[in-house]
Every structure is written in C-alpha cells, then in structure tokens.
Amino acid sequence: MFLVSTRNFPPEIGGMQNLMEGLSNALLNHGPVKIFAENIEHAEVYDQNSSLNIERISGFKIFRKYRKANLVKEFINSNEVRASFFDHWKSIEKIGEETLAKTKSFCLIHSKEINHPVGSSLNKRVL
C-alpha cells in the first residue's frame, strides 16, 4: 500500500495538482493508494468519479495541518505502507521521525523551497 499526503490535488487546477494525481494513478499499478488531501469545492464530485481512495480534511488551516498529520501518522502506524509521498515539506513536518522511519518517505521539493539561508527558521523547518 502507498500513502500520498498532499495540499495540492484535483479538482483544484495547477501543475502540482496534476503531478500528484499522476503520481497517485501511477502508483495504483503497483498496489492500493491512500490519499490524504485538503477538502476543496467540488471535491466530492471528483472523488466519486475517481478510482483513488481519497480522504479529505476540512477545517481551519491551522487545525487542518495537525488533523491531517495525525491521520497520516495513525494510518502509517496501523497499515503496511510500502512508501509515502508528500507534496511539500509542510505536509511532512508534523509527522515525526519515528513514524517516518517505518516506511520509505519521499518529499517533493518545488519552487523556491531549498534556498533558505543555513540556520534560518525556514531552513530548520525544512530539514
């Protein structure tokens, strides 16, 4: 089983959304895929027409971040996850090293996320 935790997923439109959907569909060729994504307008219609197992997380942004992290941790701890994929360092930062050590974890870095000065608060959060 594979896990995908993303802040960017259809029906929202964009390059990262297309990448995460394509990755998820490609992973289906190798086993079941569980996706944790943020709830957006028209997501229910998309999810019903998709062959992917998508769990949407709603609520205020600050609470949603912790709720999704807790759901991902619980899922990894209670399932045999072959690999987990995260679309952004913010999707992985609250998971915890102990949980991440239970599976192969991949975090996609995009945009301007890797050029923070060494020792800065953003640099420490990314690492």
Give the predicted meaning of each segment.
Residues 86-92:
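Short His-centered aromatic/hydrophobic patch
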Residues 69-79:
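Short, well-structured alpha-helical segments in soluble
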Residues 1-3:
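Extreme N-terminal starter segment of soluble prokaryotic enzymes
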Residues 92-93, 105-122:
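A short, histidine- and acid-enriched strand-loop-helix "catalytic/donor-clamping" loop
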Residues 6-13, 19-64:
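N-terminal strand-loop element at the rim of the active site
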Residues 5-6, 109:
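Alpha/beta-hydrolase
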Residues 82:
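Conserved acidic residues
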Residues 77, 125-127:
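Structural alpha-helical scaffold elements that stabilize or flank donor/cofactor-binding regions
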